C-alpha cells in the first residue's frame, strides 16, 4: 500500500537547486526519485515531436494520458526515457522548458499526469521534485521542503550551465524568461507555486549546495524518526 510509503517533497521554482538536492537525498536515504518537472518537459517534447498543438488542452490530454515515460537512475545520473529513447538532454532546453510551463497551466493536463506521478510512490520511499508535490500530488507527505532563490541568482546559474554545454546565451534574456515563468507559475488558477503548509523553507541564494543538502537531510531525518 502506497499510503505507508514515506515521501519527501521538494518544491520550488526552476533553477533553485531542487534537482541536485533531490539526487543527494535519494542517494543518502536509498529512496526512489521522481522529477515531476521532467514529466511535463517530456510531454512538451512529445507534443513537439508529434506536432500536437501545445496551446490546445483538448489535444494535450490524450497525449498526457498515454505518455510513455520512465526514469532510470541505475547508473547514478537520472535518465529520462520517452518511448524507449533517452531524452535527458533534449528536455532541458529553454524552449522545452517554457513549453512545459504552458502545458502545465491546463487543469485537465495536470489531472491526466497526476495519477502517473503518484504511481512512483514505492517502498522504501520517494523523493519528489516539483512545483506542487507537497500541495497537490503528495499532500500527506511527512516531509515537505520549499527551495527558493532569487531570479537573478537562478538566471546566473542557468547561464553558467548552458555556457558549460557550449550554448551562446544572454543573461538578460534568461532573467526575463525566468521572471515570466515565475509569474505564470505563481499566479495560475490551478496548483500555483506556493510553499506547502508546514514546509521547511530554504533560500539557496547565498547558501552552498552542501549547506542546503545538510539542512534538508537533517530536517528529514529528524522528522522521519
Curated annotation (Swiss-Prot):
Localization per record: Cytoplasm
GO molecular function terms noted in the UniProt entry: ATP binding; CMP kinase activity; dCMP kinase activity
Top-level class of the enzyme under EC nomenclature: transferase
Any Pfam family matching the protein: Cytidylate_kin
Xref: SUPFAM superfamilies: P-loop containing nucleoside triphosphate hydrolases
Any GO CC annotation of this UniProt entry: cytosol
Primary location: cytoplasm
Catalytic activity: CMP + ATP = CDP + ADP; dCMP + ATP = dCDP + ADP
EC number: 2.7.4.25
One GO process term, biological-process aspect: nucleobase-containing small molecule interconversion
Residues engaged in binding ATP: 12-20
Taxonomic superkingdom: Bacteria
Keywords from the UniProt entry: ATP-binding, Cytoplasm, Kinase, Nucleotide-binding, Transferase
UniProt-listed NCBIfam families: cmk
Family: Belongs to the cytidylate kinase family. Type 1 subfamily.
Name of the molecule in the record: Cytidylate kinase
Organism annotation: Edwardsiella ictaluri (strain 93-146)
Gene from which the chain derives: cmk
Amino acid at each position: 500500500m502506497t499510503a505507508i510509503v514515506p515521501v519527501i517533497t521538494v518544491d520550488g521554482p526552476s533553477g533553485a537547486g531542487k534537482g541536485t538536492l533531490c539526487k543527494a537525498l535519494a542517494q543518502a536515504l536509498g529512496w526512489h526519485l521522481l522529477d515531476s518537472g521532467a514529466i511535463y518537459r517530456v510531454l512538451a517534447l512529445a507534443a513537439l515531436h508529434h506536432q500536437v498543438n501545445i496551446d490546445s488542452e483538448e489535444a494535450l490530454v490524450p497525449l498526457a494520458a498515454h505518455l510513455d515515460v520512465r526514469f532510470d537512475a541505475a547508473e547514478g545520473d537520472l535518465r529520462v526515457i520517452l518511448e524507449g529513447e533517452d531524452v535527458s538532454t533534449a528536455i532541458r532546453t529553454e524552449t522545452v522548458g517554457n513549453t512545459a510551463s504552458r502545458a502545465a497551466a491546463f487543469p485537465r493536463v495536470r489531472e491526466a499526469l497526476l495519477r502517473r506521478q503518484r504511481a512512483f510512490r514505492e517502498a522504501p520511499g520517494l523523493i519528489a521534485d516539483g512545483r506542487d508535490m507537497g500541495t497537490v500530488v503528495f499532500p500527506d507527505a511527512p516531509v515537505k521542503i520549499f527551495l527558493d532563490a532569487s531570479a537573478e541568482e537562478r538566471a546566473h546559474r542557468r547561464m553558467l550551465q548552458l555556457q558549460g554545454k557550449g550554448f551562446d546565451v544572454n543573461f538578460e534574456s534568461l532573467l526575463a524568461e525566468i521572471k515570466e515563468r515565475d509569474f505564470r507559475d505563481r499566479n495560475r488558477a490551478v496548483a500555483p507555486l506556493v510553499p506547502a503548509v508546514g514546509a521547511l523553507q530554504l533560500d539557496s541564494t547565498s547558501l552552498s549546495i552542501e549547506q542546503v543538502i545538510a539542512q534538508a537531510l537533517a530536517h528529514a531525518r529528524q522528522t522521519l524518526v
